[in-house]
Amino acid sequence: MSIREWFKKKSVERAAEEKEFIMKIERDIIMALRQVYDPEIPVNVYDLGLIYEIKVNEDHEVYIQMTLTAPNCPMADYVVQQVKTAVEDVPGVVSAQIDLVWEPEWDKSRMSEEALVELGLDED
């Protein structure tokens, strides 16, 4: 194996390891978000369907797009700060940017099956 081939192989290995690490960070972020609850609803923000998007870049900076169940939620700042803190506490995360959006509008179809059962909204 030439030195060029060796460096190329190592580069590919490092890229695969980095991709795997980012996937682990994403899984850990979801676990962290499952510890953040809307103060008015006994379901976490992830299973409630309030998290629309999670992106982790190669610098381990996180972007989250989320919403709330209602635009006039009196606890909006609190919930967003709790999400930011939970994400930034995940090992490997450098920083988190939380973008609160109102489009598309949240509805119960975004909830996980567990959340629907917890709130008695399942159709069984």
Locate each region found by the language model.
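Domain-level signature for proteins that mediate thiol-based redox and metal-cofactor handling
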Residues: 1-124
